[in-house]
C-alpha cells in the first residue's frame, strides 16, 4: 500500500470549492501519516503565499486557512511550479515555510520508484 500521496492542484481561489476538496484530501493523507506533497500550478501557486489562502467555500465547509494550518502541522509540503509562479510576478520570499519552488523534475524525484497515491484537481 502506498505510504505517500501527491495532490496536483491547478485552481486557486476562483474556485474555492475545488481548492477545499483538494486540501481535505491532502490533510487526510498527511494526518493519516502519509508523506504528502501538493504540486501547485497555474493560479494555485498563490495558495503557497503566506496569508493568501483565506476563503470559506460553502456553508459547512471548513475555512481554507484552517486546512492550510492542519496540512502544515501534519508535515505536508508544497511544491510550487516556478514557471507559473514567475509568470504571475510573485516574490518567493513570501512563500510559506513548507513550500519550495520546483517543477516536474523535483516532483518525480520526490515520487521516486515507490508506489504513490495521486489526485488531480
Where are these regions (language model features)?
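Aromatic- and Gly/Pro-rich donor/ligand-binding loops
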Residues: 119-120
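C-terminal structural segments of small proteins and small subunits
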Residues: 88-114
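Short internal beta-strands
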Residues: 36-41, 78-82
Amino acid at each position: 500500500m502506498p505510504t505517500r500521496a501527491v495532490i496536483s492542484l491547478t485552481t486557486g481561489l476562483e474556485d474555492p470549492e475545488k481548492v477545499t476538496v483538494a486540501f481535505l484530501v491532502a490533510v487526510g493523507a498527511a494526518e493519516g501519516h502519509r508523506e504528502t506533497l501538493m504540486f501547485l500550478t497555474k493560479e494555485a501557486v498563490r495558495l503557497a503565499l503566506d496569508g493568501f489562502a483565506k476563503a470559506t467555500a460553502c456553508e459547512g465547509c471548513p475555512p481554507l486557512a484552517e486546512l492550510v494550518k492542519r496540512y502544515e502541522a501534519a508535515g505536508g509540503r508544497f511544491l510550487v511550479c516556478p514557471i507559473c509562479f514567475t509568470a504571475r510576478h510573485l516574490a518567493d520570499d513570501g512563500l510559506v515555510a513548507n513550500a519550495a519552488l520546483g517543477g516536474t523534475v523535483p516532483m518525480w524525484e520526490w515520487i521516486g520508484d515507490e508506489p504513490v497515491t495521486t489526485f488531480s484537481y
